[in-house]
Amino acid sequence: MLLCILLFAISGCKTYDYDYYGTISGTVLDYTDNSPIENATILMMPGSQTVQSGPDGNFIYDGLEEGQYTLSVQRSGYQSERKTVEVISGETVTTSIYLKQIPE
């Protein structure tokens, strides 16, 4: 009886085809010396999801539908930068975004 209940419950669960979604994996770097930039804010459009770059400059967006996305990157002391990437289902797009320091 318990087995029947479990099978019934499992059959009603949705499954997701993870190959349907793509990922953007990127690194924010200093234009001059290629050093990683920590705590840069990356805004993804369309949508309004933001993430912060880690100590190694890395960031990731996953579970994205196929299509074009524009990344707008900002960090205090640097000029903002935008980059458009194409997400393909089941794949990871790897990108680097270079920020130029604002002269003092």
Feature-to-residue mapping (PLM):
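Sec-dependent bacterial lipoprotein signal peptides
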Residues: 1-12
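Short, ordered, surface-exposed loop/turn motifs in non-cytosolic proteins
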Residues: 22-25, 31-46
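Short Pro-Gly-centered beta-turn/loop motif in secreted/extracellular proteins
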Residues: 60-68, 76
